[in-house]
């Protein structure tokens, strides 16, 4: 009883930190049902590989464990590459690129079968969907940084900046249109195609050397590295045109609003603020903080992006409003204030402070979120409740995208 009283008398900020969702949000979360549609170009042939791979996954392995393992592999392999190429202008040993290619392929494979494992073990839940998308938000950042290093985009800082943040923007838009329409839509060119393309970039860098991307194409007089950038840009335009077609044509809420009854444009404030802050700090830096430490800079803002994306997913699943105020902006805010006061503290030191603050804030929020939902739904995050045979799981329509459905 004393313990309960102590918990009840805890400061409001502490309760908000340990329990991010309100009682009303938790109730609406119980009613949430995963809804997705669309099949990308590479999904049909890869389904054969994913189905084969699933046979080797033991029934006792929880879907969230598969997701986390894939993320860990992707993060670790990318960090190895970053350690050799902190400015994305260096050339790393060939094996680091192969390691990143393998790490990304493993991540893609495990990310594709976690939903299949959930249905196989009858453990589909809102927690699994949230965990999957939350890990994807962070993986997006590491994929962008790793691929940019492989193509030596650090020699063109503006390209490095553009490719990294546009990658985050596309991921955010995918969930933005989900918040508006209530359904996650996959296009013909989607995340699977991008991941396979990045694996190819890593392999080419391994066998041709990262400097191969600096080769000038005769007649065209452009660097070879611009070709993957243009291909990526084409995919971005294709995907974003589809996303904004859904967003601008109104949502499923009252009077064409979002699933939470808010403006369909409101989520744009969050990603817009991240990008504007990143551009301002980059361009106003007296010490060229981005040019000298691009990977650290992108990772810091990537943590901010990951948390905001996680909150957007939560807003969709709980049909609630997405608020702009967030402690995760403290990190970029420190850099902004340091520039305002003429770099009173060394900008590199402040960048590291911002990285620590943003990463801890993101991890603490996501951990508290998963723990609160697991307690409310009486689920274990990394254990399956039962081992149900595959034939007992309902087969969904082939028109629905099932890869990431937990």
Curated annotation (Swiss-Prot):
What does the tissue specificity note say? Highly expressed in testis, colon, small intestine, heart, prostate and spleen. Also detected in kidney, skeletal muscle, pancreas, leukocytes, ovary and thymus. Weakly expressed in the brain, placenta and lung. Overexpressed in cancerous breast epithelial cell lines.
Q: Which gene encodes it?
A: CHPT1
Listed GO CC annotations: endoplasmic reticulum membrane; Golgi apparatus; Golgi membrane; intracellular membrane-bounded organelle; membrane
Q: Which reaction does it catalyse?
A: CDP-choline + a 1,2-diacyl-sn-glycerol = a 1,2-diacyl-sn-glycero-3-phosphocholine + CMP + H(+); 1-octadecanoyl-2-(5Z,8Z,11Z,14Z-eicosatetraenoyl)-sn-glycerol + CDP-choline = 1-octadecanoyl-2-(5Z,8Z,11Z,14Z-eicosatetraenoyl)-sn-glycero-3-phosphocholine + CMP + H(+); 1-hexadecanoyl-2-(9Z-octadecenoyl)-sn-glycerol + CDP-choline = 1-hexadecanoyl-2-(9Z-octadecenoyl)-sn-glycero-3-phosphocholine + CMP + H(+); 1-hexadecanoyl-2-(4Z,7Z,10Z,13Z,16Z,19Z-docosahexaenoyl)-sn-glycerol + CDP-choline = 1-hexadecanoyl-2-(4Z,7Z,10Z,13Z,16Z,19Z-docosahexaenoyl)-sn-glycero-3-phosphocholine + CMP + H(+)
Q: Which residues bind Mg(2+) 1?
A: 111, 114, 132
Report whether rRNA-binding shows up as a keyword of the record.
no
- Keywords from the UniProt entry: Acetylation, Golgi apparatus, Lipid biosynthesis, Lipid metabolism, Magnesium, Manganese, Membrane, Metal-binding, Phospholipid biosynthesis, Phospholipid metabolism, Transferase, Transmembrane, Transmembrane helix
Q: Which cofactors go with this protein?
A: Mg(2+); Mn(2+)
Instruction: Pull the Lumenal topological domain ranges from the record.
Output: 84-93, 151-160, 208-222, 282-293, 340-346
Instruction: Specify the protein's topology with respect to the membrane.
Output: Multi-pass membrane protein
Compartments reported by the entry: Golgi apparatus membrane
Which residues are listed as membrane-spanning?
Answer: 63-83, 94-118, 126-150, 161-179, 191-207, 223-248, 266-281, 294-316, 330-339, 347-376
Q: What's the protein called, per UniProt?
A: Cholinephosphotransferase 1
The active-site annotation reads 133 (proton acceptor)
Q: Which Gene3D superfamilies match?
A: 1.20.120.1760
Q: Name one GO molecular function term.
A: diacylglycerol cholinephosphotransferase activity
User: Which residues bear the site annotation Increases basicity of active site His?
Assistant: 129
**Entry's family note:** Belongs to the CDP-alcohol phosphatidyltransferase class-I family.
Residues bound to Mg(2+) 2 are: 111, 132, 136
Sequence positions bearing N-acetylalanine? 2
EC assignment: the record states 2.7.8.2
Q: What metabolic or biological pathway is this protein involved in?
A: Phospholipid metabolism; phosphatidylcholine biosynthesis; phosphatidylcholine from phosphocholine: step 2/2
Supply the source organism for this entry: Homo sapiens (Human)
Keyword Magnesium carried by entry? yes
